[in-house]
Amino acid sequence: MSKKQKNETSAKAPVKLTRAEKKEIQAVIRKYKGDGKPHSAQTSIPYEAMYQDGVCRVTPRTFSKCIEFTDISYQLAQADTKTAIFENLCDLYNYLDASIHVQFSFINCKIDPKQYAKSFEIRAQGDDFDDIRSEYSDILQDQLVNGNNGLMKRKFMTYTIEADSLKMARARLRRIETDLLGYFKSMGASAWGLDAKQRLEVMHSIFHPDGEPFSFDWKWLAPSGLSTKDFIAPSSFRFGNARMFGLGGKYGAVSFLQILSPELSDEMLADFLNTENGIVVNLHVQAIDQSDAIKTVKRKITDLDAMKIQEQKRAVRSGYDMDILPSDLATYGQDAKELLKTLQSRNERMFQLTFLVLNTADTRQKLENDVFWASGIAQKYNCSLVRLDYQQEQGLMSSLPLGASHIQIERSLTTSSVAVFVPFVTQELFQGGDAMYYGINAKTGNMIMLDRKRARCPNGLKLGTPGSGKSMSCKSEILSVFLCTPDDVYICDPEAEYYPLVKRLHGQVVKLSPTSKNYVNPLDINLNYSEDENPLALKSDFVLSFCELVMGGKNGLEAIEKTVIDRAVQVIYRPYLADPKPENMPILADLHKALLDQHIPEADRVAQALDLYVSGSLNVFNHRTNIDIKNRIVAFDIKELGKQLKKIGMLIVQDQIWGRVTQNRSKGKATWYFCDEFHLLLREEQTAAFSCEIWKRFRKWGGIPTGATQNVKDLLSSPEIENILENSDFICLLNQASGDRKILAERLNISPQQLRYVDNSEPGEGLLIYENVILPFKNPIPKNTQLYQIMTTRLGEGATV
């Protein structure tokens, strides 16, 4: 203010107010001065600042950070696995000292169903497959409605410390986060720290239970003058009612768990979370300094001893036995001494636990029903769920993952008692992007959506007894690949089961038989056949496998026989490698001649075995390839090859598909290969070794093979089965015979609880193993659909073709 303005101001005569005007002004001041209570939704949210790296200043000297972690399969795990998880969880709690407050938050929040359904939508393309797309989409939508995928289940751990400055807080929070992530990793759970935007999104989901989209950008704050709270707050809070509150257009209520049971179950928390309703469960855990805890227990024992002495004195004065004490006093004394022993001699500490349950609903009646349901869960475990009277606001704010509890209702528990609330139930498999449908989780009802290409090794196996739904499972996956990806699909079909599906998808069926005019040359090769400079090395392995099957015998090929075959291979491919024209491609007759030209007994013996396949009645493979494969989906029907040629036919088909894989690799296209009766390729030593080598190479070249068989014992008895299993991150187990169940449980580390799902299971039900996750699943396909008709192999149910 300038001197002139000051002079002008001072020159003005003071305004005199009447008594009435003074009263009016004082009333206005009182009105707007406030009563110390928040008067906006934003000011009710109890934190001071949120920083971009995810650190939150809750109070001037209190800072918190948040970790999100994934679920793991705990309830169906092996007993020793459950014990290991529990012990690691105890170690995590014991890591916490009295300066760290921890809050576990389990949030079941709804998401926008329309947005969610878009991920399953298969758009019409105006071709002959739109009716299939529509029917397939309807099945996915039905599963979405029947399951509880409308809820997103998320798990968080928020940890809070006190510090004199933000800089000091950040340094310590970072160290704690590193340690906590290590504990989660040891339990098999993925975990990661959240930044500020992610933390705000979590709080937004609690304040907007309907799944309203969250929009926020740091650039918006300065121009708008808004704070981070403005982007997460609901339209209003209403805390007038003592036992519930209003949240925008919703109703909510917070209750606390009164732990009355002498023993706690590790299934209680899982039961609270196993609901189709929106629920938020919070566990606030505060460690007590060990020396303080021991002193407190000792004081209690001293107090109990004093009471015991008083009772004994009273007994003496009254003239009855001084050893007769009130039962409660004796029990409390024993419990206190046992607790002291636990704290002093075992790896146990003391914690204060506050267990809060937040329910939200559209109407008061629905809210009361949800709270009643939650109370029933507590009652099941001999506990009580008590509504927070006149503390609903504090309860709601304590349910935010900020790491601060405003409810002073605590229960003292030891490490193992707190760890009983295991934060894991069962893992879900729900990947976004190009994931495909593989059924529903039999434990939770949620859809299983997977993208096998994301696996370390996408190779797969499908094992099951006859009638267990093995072929149906393969066909369902083939259909998903066809509808959802541009990939090629090849099928080795020993029983002619895939014809209706392939024809309906306008695919190509290549029928191989002694009387067929479709020919496939087993000696076909292309210059991309192997990643080595010389493609003959891998092709020679194939020819050795072919000759092994031709010659038969239990001991396979002898060393000299392998040498003469390899020598012949080098000779017959020279013309083609010099001038790669189709007419220079060798056939079996060329191999036969090259063997005879060596003029040694071992070569003659191999050539004589080849006679039947060169000039005899089984010469179907002594021709150049005359089929032109241009289709996306191709089935090789080898049913009519007969028993003598079946294994040879499967080996040749596998080699043909390997050639297609090498061609597709240069185009950047994935190639799916489904091989039924896969165990036949693993019986003979050389053939098994070649098949295993191809199995390994598929992954590098963009191939995704799937072997299916009902002869699990034969498969598992192969010397190469270990390599096959190690290179297969996708295994679908359907119903299994008793002996097979035991072998599979041992080989694949399946728990007895999980094994129940492959014991007399219905068709299309079993266990899905994806990388390290084992899930029980169901894959029902309605019988009244076109899809069922073209996929079933049951007599009288399939489509007429």
Segments predicted by a language model, with ranges:
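Post-Walker A helix-loop "phosphate-sensing" segment adjacent to the P-loop in P-loop NTPases
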Residues: 480-490
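Hydrophobic positions on the alpha1 helix immediately C-terminal to the Walker A/P-loop
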Residues: 473
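Conserved lysine of the Walker
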Residues: 470
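A short helix-turn-beta junction within AAA+ P-loop NTPase domains corresponding to the substrate/partner-engaging
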Residues: 506-510, 720-733
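P-loop NTPase motor domains
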Residues: 72, 79-98, 109, 271-273, ...
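Hydrophobic anchor at the beta1->P-loop junction of P-loop NTPases
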Residues: 462
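Extended, folded cores of ATP/NTP-driven motor/assembly subunits in large transport
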Residues: 2-424
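Conserved P-loop NTPase
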Residues: 748-800
